[in-house]
Each structure stands twice: as structure tokens, then as C-alpha cells.
From Swiss-Prot:
Name recorded for this polypeptide: Carbamoyl phosphate synthase large chain
Note describing how the cofactor binds: Binds 4 Mg(2+) or Mn(2+) ions per subunit.
Naturally occurring in which organism (per UniProt): Bacillus cytotoxicus (strain DSM 22905 / CIP 110041 / 391-98 / NVH 391-98)
Lineage start: Bacteria, Bacillati, Bacillota, Bacilli, Bacillales
Keywords on record: Amino-acid biosynthesis, Arginine biosynthesis, ATP-binding, Ligase, Magnesium, Manganese, Metal-binding, Nucleotide-binding, Pyrimidine biosynthesis, Repeat
Cofactor requirement: Mg(2+); Mn(2+)
Catalysed reaction equations from the record: hydrogencarbonate + L-glutamine + 2 ATP + H2O = carbamoyl phosphate + L-glutamate + 2 ADP + phosphate + 2 H(+)
Amino acid sequence: MPKRLDINTILVIGSGPIVIGQAAEFDYSGTQACQSLKEEGYKVILVNSNPATIMTDTATADKVYIEPLTLEFVSRIIRKERPDAILPTLGGQTGLNMAVELAKSGVLEECGVEILGTKLSAIEQAEDRDLFRTLMQELNEPTPPSEIVHTLDEAYEFVKEIGYPVIVRPAFTLGGTGGGICHNEEELIEIVTSGLKHSPVTQCLLEKSIAGFKEIEYEVMRDANDNAIVVCNMENIDPVGVHTGDSIVVAPSQTLSDREYQMLRNTSLRIIRALGIEGGCNVQLALDPYSFQYYVIEVNPRVSRSSALASKATGYPIAKLAAKIAVGLTLDEIVNPVTQKTYACFEPALDYVVSKIPRWPFDKFESANRTLGTQMKATGEVMSIGRNLEESLLKAVRSLELGIYHLELNHLKELDKETMKKRIIKADDERLFIVAEAIRQGVTKEEIHEWCEMDFFFLQKIENIVNMERKVKANVGDMEVLREAKEMGFSDHYIASAWNKTECEIYATRKENGIMPVFKMVDTCAAEFESATPYYYSTYGDENESIVTERKSVMVLGSGPIRIGQGVEFDYATVHSVWAIKEAGYEAIIVNNNPETVSTDFSISDKLYFEPLTIEDVMHIIDLEKPEGVIVQFGGQTAINLAAKLAERGVKILGTSLEDLDRAEDRDKFEAALTELGIPQPVGKTATTVEQAVAIAEEIGYPVLVRPSYVLGGRAMEIVYRQEELLHYMKNAVKVHADHPVLIDRYMVGKEIEVDAISDGENVYIPGIMEHIERAGVHSGDSIGVYPPQSLSAKVKEQIIENTIALGRGLKIVGLLNIQFVVFKDEVYVIEVNPRASRTVPFLSKITGVPMANIATKVILGKNLVEQGYETGYHPEDNEVYVKAPVFSFAKLRSVDTTLGPEMKSTGEVMGKDLTLEKALYKGLVAAGISIPTHGSVIITVADKDKEEAIEIARRFHEIGYNLLATAGTAKSLTEQNIPVQVVNKIDSEDYNLLDIIRQGKAQFVINTLTKGKQPARDGFRIRRESVENGVACLTSLDTTRAILRVLESMTFSAHTMKEIAPTTRHEVVHA
């Protein structure tokens, strides 16, 4: 069937900000889909609220709207643009829910817009638990015994019949939000209540737990002619019971017999046909390891996290083809872009093993509940490819960037058998490592299997790794053993420590003895046809398939897995850098290991190496390719941290030199540079012992900001107000010694300003200055940023521009730099300088129209700013106002404190733009998921130091008609100022108290500032968590509260009594 000619304009709905459960995979699929539709000659309109992505670049679609993904705003765009159709299946859960909402509101019918890809009925059949169950019964496909409930009482009835454990799955939610496994009544009450709250239709499915079955996924495609194929099947190493986004996954499946494989394949194809999906779809199945009994767990009628993984694992571009199918093309008409010879109806074949390991945020959230269940907690993932499972798994472990080079964690060596048993039974993020540790300590595979039901095949593979460790240790210097260990994926780092040598020595020994990897191509067809993809992985074997060309090449290091503090913004900069390298006439080589991103799409660079970002793995590629140099400033801290090791090995680092990178990152050298340039900074010193830290803090005076040097995303930073807090920090947050000093600064309560600039060492061009709404002390990634700045005097702005130019020149920066200033009593101080791409590059590039990463790359390659048409100075400001607002994933992470501070906590960002600050803020807040009702109640409980500021805020809430609720202490200070307030009980009171008000949805906002002494037992922590669990906006910064007030005041009309007319006396009347 040829493509449809009755439609011209297609609206593509993006997936919005990055949250846990919906990360960069939709930037990748959305970008592919838009390009794919444009190739076919359609006019593409895109709406998405996330400014950090390639997808929202103006080149991706014909028209790009960065607006909130709400019914109100999307409807407005549909009425204005009048598209013929919308394609929602590439925008994740957000896109699907949006399509359902638009259809129900009647706007699609009113404007004559049809839904492409997956019909509305199919979305509802797959997402609505009741309809899905009915469909499965019609197809005679088994699902676990289950019951749809709308209330807690209905849940009790079901459990009486079926018994514990049961799994709770809320309808229409993302990444299992609100769901979980219940083993007893207490858990049932908590999880069902939370599930009903999170489901937009107040509906949960309760099903008998089949935890322990094998979890298998099939990624399938179907077209309008009913051709259907399996692109990839995957197996979770973790059995059913852990969310697939939190599971370690291998592809192709490793433990299925042919009969099992075909049985599940047929089921998957039968389901996609019954749903009538045209495009991609993901089917999750549970298989009893001891019989042929299986159950269908769920179906995602859209492109998903698994399809991004399947695309990268096979090389078969699912999203690109799903978009073509949506407009009527069929699989037998579409050429597979990888081989450029075969058609898309050939099922991919793999001659390698792929492993995916999730990347969790627990290194940032020490207190979070680490247990894994049916609710997803990972922020990102890594993928690696090898010729055997052991190699593939160990490469994935190295890719995680947790400073781990092997399947072992030192702190687990102390665990006794009982503790290991507990942690293996109840899965957490370290289970794989604990299993390896248990095998090392002689626990049998049978016992481990009994604890966690992991398949014996996988346990055997882990045992093979442990046996090889013993062999390596027993045969120091044996070349045959070295070769065997390398074939199994062992790192030089591990072998070096076992043989008591340095990593460089092991590398050199291997080189002398010819034990070096070769690079193999990913070609979708197991080398059956010739292939045109420059997409490679390393392994130890015979033939090298990566052909080095005559052209000069430049290598860019990517930023690895998405985690808090290092998000999709860095991938954006990486991709733009690669494009600029190609424009400059070089061959662009990229090294990265994140399957979700645009940068790991083989069509972006000239050569893609899917490898861990460790010194050993990167050096193998450099030895083969011999590039002109390596660019490290776009890969976040990951790449910067490799710079010194690369330079030691004689690799040329392009851009800012290593000495200058160090001058910006090393505290003492940086201070010296600032003093030399005459630029002020907050008083601060470096401590290498606890005693020193105490003395410094006494000298400069509390409050002080403490942090380790060389960090990203403000890890382990804190503001401390007195000595015992400082001691607590030094003991718990950091291990201080001469190599890892701790920085102690005077904390200034000032306005924070952020600047991004491009420097060629001589000229410095400043695209934009951003003002933060939250005062200094809240991490810049968690602050609301505003461009152009709204409250800076001309003098201060001038000072900021001068300082930026002086720093670019003085630090000899070549490429990008990002500076954070604090303005305190009208004086400008420098807090820090980052000599690399920052997380604001995409945002500023889009709003100023200055392609920062592109210009910076060309500067790095030797073309100065003047030659590119840019002068030293500040880019003219726009008359529109742009707001960048952070988005958090607290609902997914139990027991994490939501207070904002110097440690970054947000996972994503959105943008709001309009003609006034108030309107732009409104859009930014709404896009970030904060509802802004014009009336209601606000609970105010603040720390003593904030009482004065809170009075003015309370008065403004009262003026616009909000009802004020406060606990006794805060209420007293409000009453004294004649502000009417209703006193509510503190949370330790038995009677109706503050938490009850939040639980019953009777408060629209909660304003709660931190009382120091961060034990979770504190009232504040419980108030903040309760707000998150109940979807109430909880404001922990009075600056954010003021911003929301500005919006509310601009939306509501004021109501004031008339002025009294003063009585006039006769002689005041003037006669004409």
C-alpha cells in the first residue's frame, strides 16, 4: 500500500520532560519519527515541552512548539494549525494519555483530526486494565487471576479469595507509578491507596503475584496489510516482580527452548493483530520455568524504552519505520536503512549478546528505599555488546560509571550469609553484585536459585566469571590466562590489581603479546548480507570489521547513562558537536553506551562505537582510529574525568588545554587565577582534615557551604549552620584526605546568575545571561531560570559581562564555558566556572538562536569566533520572556526528602515562553506538572528564620482570596500582623491534623521550609513526603512561592473596598 496522500500535515506529540520511567528514549524515537515523516514529504508540526532535546530543535520539524503538554495548550495549537492527523505513539505514556484526553474533549472531532498509528480503541484496550483483560479472554490468552478495583474494600474482597502476595497495577500510569507487590494487609492498604490516587481513572488491577516466573519481552511491528514481525526478543535476568525498566535485560533471550520461543512469538503476534496496531508494540510475558504455562503481563501499544533498546541492540530503527507505517507504508515496501538492500519485513538476526543494566539514582539519594519492585526507580541505562554473555555483562558493569570495573563491590565483602540471603530475596540495585559475592563465598547456585529464582543459566555465567577471577589470581603473568580473561570481558583494571601491576603495564603487555580486541559490526542480519552501517562493538576474536579510512577524524566522547546531574542536555551538545565536525570536513567518531539517546543512532556520526567510557575501552578505539584529537567538553563530567588519563597516554585533547581545565576545577589554582584577574569570590578555604574544616568554618563564620572538589550536579554539597552539622557532614557525606579535599565557603544569601559563553582564548561571545528565581544555595539545575534577566541593574549586568570576558581570556578557554555568579548587596561574586558544555546549552541555544555547541566545536577545530561572524560581547536580548523550570521524580522515590538545596534532585526540565514573566512562569510551572488553582487553601509551616518573610507571602495569598492554614507557631506570628489564619494541629497530634488535610486534598499548596537536622523523623520531612504522595505542590523555597504568587496575582482580579471619601470643609473649595 503506498503512503497516504489524503493527509498533508501531521502533529507529533512529544513526551515532555525526563522523569523516571520516561527518559531520553523518546527524544530518540521522536526525532527519528519527525525526520522519517519529512522524508515522505509530510509537513510535520511538533509540540513538546522539553527544551533539552534534539527533538525540539527547529530543524527536526517544519514547525516546533515548545509549550506545556496539557489539554488547554495542545488544543490551542490544533485549532491554530488545523493538522490532518496526530501521531501520539512516539511520545511515550504522555503522548498516549494526551491523545485519549484530546479525543474525549471533542477537539479532534471539531477540527477533523484523525489519530495515526494506534487507534484510540487500541490505546484504551491496552491501557485500560478491564478492557485488556476482556480482550485476552476473547483470544484465549492466559492472564494471571485478577480483579479490577476502584476502592480499598474491593481489594479486600479479592485478597480473601486469592491470598497474598498480590501485584497492584494502576491504569494509565507510567513506569508503574503507584503500584507494587503486597505481602500483607498493611502493604495492601498503602499500595492500593497510592495506586488509586495515581491512576487518572481511579482504577487498579490486582493480580495474583507470579513473581519468580521468567520475564520475556517481544518487540513487534505490524502494518496496515497485517504483516507482522518480531524485531527482537529480550529476557530479563531478574524474574517477574522487578519492573522491566529496573531489570537487567539480555537480548536475544538466552534460556528459551525453540518451542517456548515460538509459542511466545505467536502469542505476541496474535495480540498486536487483535489490537490492530499499525506501528511498534511491546508485549511482556511471564513464563513458568518448569512447564509451558505462560501469562500475558501487559502490552504497550507504542514505542517504548524497550523499543529504543531493541533498536540499538539490533540496529533495526523501530521508531523510524513505525512512523512510515503510520502513514500507510507496509513492511515489504520499506527498505531496511541498515543493509540498504533487504526490506523491513526481514526479522533481524543477532550474532552477539546484548546486556542492559539500569542506572539508579541511589548514589545521590542515600536515604531512598533501594528495594526494587513493580515501580520503576532507574533514571537511565547502559547497554553493551559482546560475543558471550560474560563479556557483554562485564562491559555493561564498567559502563555504569559508578567507579566499578568488575562484578564486585568492596563494601559487600563484609556481608554474612544471612544478610546476603535477605538482600537476594528482596531485590535491590546491588543484587547482581551480591549474587557474585555469594558465589565467591561458596554459596551454591541451588541455594541462590531458591532465594531469587534467577535461572541457573545466568547463575552459571556469574560462576564462570568468579572461577576466572580465581584462575587470574593463581596464574600471575600467564599470557594464555590473560587472553582467556580478556575474552570473558575482564578489564585491565581488575587484572592489574590481581597481578599487582598498573593498568598501563597490563595494556602494554597485551599489546606486545597481540592480545588486542577487534571491532565487529552491528548489521541486523548476522552478516548474511553486506551492510552499510558504521556501528561497532569490541570483542576478542579474529577479523576486525572496522575499516580505518584515509580521512582525518575527530573523536567525541559521549556522556554515558542518564542520571541526576547529567541528563539529555549533554547528549544534545554531543550530537551538535558531531554535526559540526562533519560540516568542518572531518570524519566524526562517537563513543557512547547509552541506548536511549540520539547520539547512539548510527546515522548521526560517521562511526559509532558502542563501548564503555573507561580509559581502556576508549584507548582501544584510539589505537585503531588514530584521530587528530579527542573532544571532551560535551560529555559532561564523564568525559572531563577521562581527559587527564588520555593526555598521559599521549592523546591530544582538543579545546581548552588540560592545564587550563585544571585551573578551573582545582580550587587553589582557581582562587589564584581569580585574584590575578581581580575578580571577587566568596571567602573560602580548602580543608584536608576534619580539624582543619572546623577551624576554617569558625574563621569565616557560619552559615558555610561545604562540598568536595571535582563534582557534577552538586553531589554531597550542603549548607551547614553550626559545628555539629559540620561534623555530621564530614563523618557521613565525604571521606576527606589530601587527594580529596573539602571546600568550605561563606554562604551568601544572594541572587544567583548563570552565564554560558563561547571563547576562542581571545574573543568571548556571550549568548545569554540567566537569572535564577531561587537564591544562591539551591542547585542551578533545580532552580527556575529566567531569560532575559528581570531584576539586574545595568551596572551589575555590565560587571557580569566584563567578568565573563576576563575569565574566558584569563583561563584561556577554547570552546564553551559556564559561570555561576552570586549578586550580593549589588556586588558580583564568582561561585564557579565550568570549562565545558553545561546543562543550559540547549535551552539558551534555542531561545537565542545561537547554535552554541556548533560554534564551540568549530572554535575547537581552529576556526575563531570572528571568522564565524561573532564578536566579543553580549548577544542582543529578546523581548519575549523564557522560563526554564525543573521537573522532579519524587513520586517514584519513596523516603527521599524533597527539600531543595545545593545537591541536585531534578531529573528533567521544561520551558515556558511568553510576552510577560508571569505568563511564561505560568506555562513553565504548568508544563512541570504543578497545578495553579486561582483559589483554595495554603498550609504554611516555616522555620523560625523564615517567619518574617513568610508574613508578606501570607498576606499576598490572603489578598487573592486563599484560605490560610498554619501550625500554632506560624499562626501566632500571622495573627499578630492581623492576617486571618486557621490553626491546624501538628502532625504528632492524635486529632485531625495537618497530614489529614493534605491526604484529603483540602490544601492546594504546602509551604514548608527546612528546620535543620535532617533526620527523616522530623515533622517537615513527613509533611513534604505526604504532599508528594498526594500530588500537592510542596514549596520548600520562599522564592519559588513568590514566583507562583506573581502568576496567581496576574490571573486573579483584585477585590478591594472603595477608598473612603474624606469630608471636605468649606474653605478648601476653590472657586474659579
